Amino acid sequence: MAIKIGITGPVGSIKAEALQKIIGMLQNDGLNVQGVLISKVSDDGKLTGYTIEDILTKKKVQFCDEKFVSRVKIDKLGVDTRLLEEILIPSLQKARESADVIIIDEVGKLENTTKKIHSEIEETLKCGKPLIVTLHKRSRNPVLQEIKSLEGVRVFDITPINKNILPFKVMHVLKGEE
């Protein structure tokens, strides 16, 4: 049974910082880490969009922007679903084939953008590989509820107090030491 880890926390960069640290630790252990990372784009402190990056290929595109006209929105910003699918779908397919550990950053924001993305994320959540997902802490989030219901899942809530120790705790869980 593959270990599934959910990292929840407040809006802000502490989840991203912890995730980057975990990815670095996994790669230092010689593991093949694949999946996607989401980053905020801001202008003078105002959120203006999001980028998605394939961890393996380093290909990165801005898929969400205040200037994009779209029915699909994330945080009231327009989403270019074609750009999102171009990175996310092949990244998760490849990760299911060849990764040692799969990462899906901000899964809650992404999951309901298109049916293709929803099914790709569902398939990845159920695959037999170790998986780390991050999402905003919202108890009514259906993705969080789904992740919690998966067999072998551990959910950690990151806070400013535990943000430095959490990556080590996640590593212990992935190694079966906890």
Swiss-Prot record:
Pfam families: NTPase_1 (PF03266). Disulfide bonds: none annotated. Gene3D superfamilies: P-loop containing nucleotide triphosphate hydrolases. It catalyses: a ribonucleoside 5'-triphosphate + H2O = a ribonucleoside 5'-diphosphate + phosphate + H(+). ATP binds at residues 9-16, 101-108. One of its GO terms (molecular function) is ribonucleoside triphosphate phosphatase activity. SUPFAM superfamilies: P-loop containing nucleoside triphosphate hydrolases (SSF52540). CDD domains: RecA-like_Thep1. InterPro entries: Nuc-triphosphatase_THEP1, P-loop_NTPase. Keywords: ATP-binding, Hydrolase, Nucleotide-binding. Belongs to the THEP1 NTPase family. Has nucleotide phosphatase activity towards ATP, GTP, CTP, TTP and UTP. May hydrolyze nucleoside diphosphates with lower efficiency. HAMAP family: NTPase_1. This is Nucleoside-triphosphatase THEP1. It comes from Thermoplasma volcanium (strain ATCC 51530 / DSM 4299 / JCM 9571 / NBRC 15438 / GSS1).
